[in-house]
C-alpha cells in the first residue's frame, strides 16, 4: 500500500491518496566477470521499468473526492543500471565500488481526482502529485584492510546526485 498526503497548499490542504497493492511484471538482466586469483569481480545489471495500474482512493478534508469518473492511475517505476566491482590488492587490502543510474525523470504520479482538481482550478496539467526533475546518479568507492581473520577496517566515500525535489 502507498499513502500520500499534502499540507502545503490551500487547494490541496489535507489531500490524501491511497493506492492499494498491485502486482506487475518487470525483468532484470546482468553480466558478471571475475578473475578469482586476483579476487576481481565486476558486474553490470539492468532493471526494467515496471508499469502499474491501480485505482486510487482520494479524499480531501476527510471527504471522498468524486469530481471526475474514476480511472486507473498509471504509475511506471523507473529503469536503472548498476555497475559494481571489487578487487583484492597486495597486503590484505581490498578495493570496491559501484555506480548507479536511475531514470527518475520519467517517474510521475497523477491520480484521476487530483488531475480533476487541477483542471477545475484552471491549472491544467502544470504539475503532478509526485514528479522528479532529473535522473539520479550515485557512486561509492571504498578501501578495506584485513588486520586479522576477525578484524577489518574500511573507509568509504559516497556521492548521490538526488532526483530533484518531488
Predicted regions: what they are:
Residues 1-166:
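Outer-membrane beta-barrel porins/channels
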Amino acid at each position: 500500500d502507498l499513502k500520500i498526503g499534502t499540507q502545503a497548499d490551500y487547494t490541496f490542504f489535507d489531500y490524501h491518496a491511497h493506492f492499494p497493492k498491485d502486482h506487475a511484471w518487470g525483468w532484470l538482466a546482468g553480466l558478471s566477470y571475475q578473475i578469482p586469483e586476483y579476487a576481481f569481480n565486476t558486474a553490470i545489471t539492468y532493471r526494467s521499468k515496471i508499469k502499474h495500474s491501480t485505482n486510487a482512493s482520494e479524499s480531501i478534508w476527510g471527504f471522498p473526492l468524486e469530481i471526475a469518473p474514476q480511472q486507473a492511475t498509471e504509475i511506471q517505476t523507473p529503469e536503472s543500471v548498476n555497475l559494481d566491482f571489487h578487487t583484492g590488492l597486495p597486503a590484505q587490502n581490498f578495493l570496491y565500488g559501484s555506480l548507479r543510474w536511475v531514470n527518475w525523470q520519467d517517474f510521475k504520479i497523477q491520480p484521476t481526482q487530483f488531475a480533476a482538481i487541477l483542471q477545475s482550478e484552471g491549472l491544467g496539467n502544470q504539475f503532478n502529485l509526485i514528479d522528479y526533475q532529473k535522473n539520479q546518479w550515485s557512486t561509492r568507492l571504498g578501501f578495506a584492510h584485513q588486520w586479522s581473520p576477525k578484524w577489518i577496517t574500511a573507509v568509504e566515500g559516497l556521492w548521490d546526485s538526488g532526483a530533484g525535489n518531488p
